[in-house]
Amino acid sequence: MGRGRVELKRIENKINRQVTFAKRRNGLLKKAYELSILCDAEVALIIFSSRGKLYEFSSASSMMTTLEKYQQCSYASLDPMLPVSDTQMNYNEYVRLKARVELLQRSQRHILGEDLGTLNSKELEQLEHQLDASLKKVRSKKTQSMLDQLADLQEKEQMLEEANKQLKNKLEESAARIPLGLSWGNNGGQTMEYNRLPPQTTAQPFFQPLRLNSSSPQFGYNPNMGANDHEVNAATTAHNINGFIPGWML
């Protein structure tokens, strides 16, 4: 028994709809490829899923080539005597830019490793070479950036060395202008040698030295002495006192 005829209507089951889309899409892409090979025809196929995902096939070098050819053929069939309105020109520009944007988006997805199932071995090889060239450019740019940073650091190092040298020269000049009497000790303290004070002139002492009487001192009362002797001793004692006590105390 053969398969029954499939009714053409929207498949309500989501899973069945996705499975059917994948099978029919692959079959359609295969048919387009076979047509381009068997009949040597230029075939371009564009498919958008319900979620807006793009699937395409182009037997030419790029989809843009086929689209530009299609655009030229479509508008060349118009009567050349009829003036082209601004609206038509704007629409033509819109179609061209839209095709360009779609091509760039497709290339971007391929570079990111997406939607590679529709590419053949030749296109995959071209993509590999493109990625290798891009990687070499990135590495070269990174190396150049690191070399520039190294050169800047070396220049700053030279500037710091020059500034350090100038500060050292200023410090030596300042040290040369300091008096010889000022020096720095090993312990970081400051030692200053002061000039010796001039010798003081010899002055009279504040207190005069005591001058002792040659006669022996007498202590107590001697009964053998007479009145005249006591008077003599009193006078002698007064004289001795005058000799012992400074004049300013009398």
Curated annotation (Swiss-Prot):
The keyword tRNA-binding does not apply. GO terms for cellular component: nucleus. InterPro entries: MADS-box/MEF2_TF (IPR050142), MEF2-like_N (IPR033896), TF_Kbox (IPR002487), TF_MADSbox (IPR002100), TF_MADSbox_sf (IPR036879). Keywords: DNA-binding, Nucleus, Transcription, Transcription regulation. One of its GO terms (biological process) is positive regulation of transcription by RNA polymerase II. MADS-box transcription factor that acts redundantly with EJ2 to control meristem maturation and inflorescence architecture. This is MADS-box protein J2. It comes from Solanum lycopersicum (Tomato). The lineage of its organism: Eukaryota, Viridiplantae, Streptophyta, Embryophyta, Tracheophyta. The gene is J2.
